[in-house]
Regions:
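Glycine-rich phosphate-binding active-site loops on the catalytic face of alpha/beta enzymes
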Residues: 26-38, 84, 88-100, 145-158, ...
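Glycine-enriched alpha-helix->loop->beta-strand junction motifs that scaffold or abut catalytic
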Residues: 20-27, 52-54, 89-92, 115-119, ...
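Active-site-proximal loop/turn and secondary-structure-junction residues that shape catalytic pockets
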Residues: 12-14, 31-33, 61-65, 97-99, ...
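Catalytic cores of alpha/beta
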Residues: 11-21, 69-81, 128-143, 167, ...
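Hydrophobic faces of well-ordered beta-strands that scaffold small-molecule active sites
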Residues: 4-10, 27-29, 57-61, 93-95, ...
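Active-site beta->alpha loop and helix N-cap motifs at the rims of alpha/beta catalytic domains
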Residues: 13, 45-51, 55-106
Length: 251
């Protein structure tokens, strides 16, 4: 039997609870999901740690959306966020930094890795926009990261199957490949079979309606970027169970 591991990308404490109940081994807690995930708040991390009794807690360390080229003040912010996550009991973190030329920013990563000593580290999807995946793989291994979260440099992990397979073969067990982006109950079996990857990152979210009786839908909190204030996406126990079950049931 293969030792599959399932990480759920959670956007709230509510989603963390659902992930744990659904059987996730680990969560990656994020704020700012529409931006690709940003560092969650102190309170969110603290409450997630409180409710996650059987599921490991990882926290994304990303001070903003956009690219992965960080200023000195942003790097200092990331260092402080790593320390915050550690103090609150996180088991690990996810971060990634690039140079302006799309290379892994090794000196900055070394600072973050030193600050993360004793924590499990995922080099997140900054990898998917780097210039040279093969070179980056070796650099990330040398940095001592535990895993790389990647879609195979494509819009979804399913489209990235060829590179995911190649990366796993190149890694030769020196680092874990965590397949993520668009992984769901319908495609997880194909991704596992065709890549040989054993760790999967997915959100298992559904949209739920707001409980507000009064709604002023003429106003958007996002200004010109319209995201409805009257519905939100949360991880559901059923979708977590279905995604895990569809793979483990065919072992």
């Amino acid at each position: 039997m293969k030792n599959y591991l399932f990480e759920v990308c959670t956007n709230s404490v509510e989603s963390c609870i659902a992930a744990q109940e659904g059987g996730a081994n680990r969560v990656e807690l994020c704020a700012g999901i529409p931006e690709g995930g940003t560092t969650p708040s102190y309170g969110e991390i603290a409450m997630a740690r409180e409710v996650l009794t059987t599921t490991r807690l990882h926290v994304i360390i990303r001070p903003r959306g956009g690219d992965f080229l960080y200023s000195p003040i942003e790097i200092k912010t990331m260092l402080k966020d790593i320390e915050m996550a550690r103090r609150l009991g996180a088991d690990g973190g996810g971060f990634g930094c690039l140079t302006a030329n799309g290379e892994i920013d090794v000196p900055v990563m070394e600072q973050l890795m030193e600050a993360s000593e004793g924590l499990s580290v995922t080099f997140h999807r900054a990898f998917d926009v780097c210039r040279d995946a093969s070179k980056a793989l070796e650099q990330i291994i040398n940095l001592g990261c535990d895993r790389i979260l990647t879609s195979g440099q494509q819009a979804t992990a399913e489209l990235g199957i060829p590179l995911l397979k190649e990366l796993r073969e190149r890694a030769k067990g020196r680092i874990t490949l965590l397949a993520g982006c668009g992984v769901n109950e319908k495609n997880i079996c194909r991704i596992a079979k065709e890549t040989g990857i054993q760790e999967f990152h997915f959100s298992a979210r559904e949209s739920i309606k707001s409980g507000m009786a009064y709604k002023n839908e003429a106003v958007s909190m996002g200004g010109t970027v319209h995201i409805s204030e009257y519905e939100r996406n949360v991880t559901t126990v059923k979708r977590v169970k279905d995604t895990i079950g569809n793979l483990t049931s065919v072992i």
